[in-house]
Amino acid sequence: MKSLQKGFTLIELMIVVAIIGILAAIAIPQYQNYIARSQVSRVMSETGQMRTAIETCLLDGKKADECFIGWTKSNLLGASGSPSSSNDSTADHPGQGGLVIDYKLEADATNAITATFGQNAAATLHGKALKWTRDPKATWSCSTDVELKFRPTGCKDDLK
């Protein structure tokens, strides 16, 4: 009686391993790009939410230390140390490096929220910044110095 062989031959297994290797070589860089894009979008959204609180503070004539901005610490920020500013007013966020909120109470002042990516962000984002700027006409715009392929739709301007 003949015995039937079961299983795969060595050649078949080597072909499967080669196919998996090729797919992984394509998928891993694409996934890393996806992670970087999602982190930039997340920081844009997190910092963008503070615009309403800042507008309210400006309209009420409050200084930064009198305002509740509603910031929750982010693990993606932190490259530049503690928040600081040379302007009239800076919101203080204890323990959150890489976040600076500068605003003045004058009607024609330019105000900004600047977030700097820290070590927990994707390697291509370390030390890069995303900035919301409010012009004297009360219009907010987003700019960043991250690579163009990682920028969200609403933040295509180069950081000035």
Curated annotation (Swiss-Prot):
The pili are polar flexible filaments of about 5.4 nanometers diameter and 2.5 micrometers average length; they consist of only a single polypeptide chain arranged in a helical configuration of five subunits per turn in the assembled pilus. Major component of the type IV fimbriae that plays an essential role in twitching motility, natural transformation, and protease secretion. It comes from Dichelobacter nodosus. Residues 1-7 form a propeptide. Disulfide bonds: none annotated. The lineage of its organism: Bacteria, Pseudomonadati, Pseudomonadota, Gammaproteobacteria, Cardiobacteriales. Belongs to the N-Me-Phe pilin family. GO terms for biological process: cell adhesion; protein secretion by the type II secretion system. It is found in: Fimbrium; Membrane. Keywords: Fimbrium, Membrane, Methylation, Transmembrane, Transmembrane helix. The keyword Zinc-finger does not apply. Signal peptide: none annotated. This is Type IV major fimbrial protein FimA. The modification N-methylphenylalanine is found at residue 8. The keyword Transmembrane applies. Pfam families: N_methyl (PF07963), Pilin (PF00114). The chain crosses the membrane at residues 8-28. GO terms for cellular component: membrane; pilus; type II protein secretion system complex.
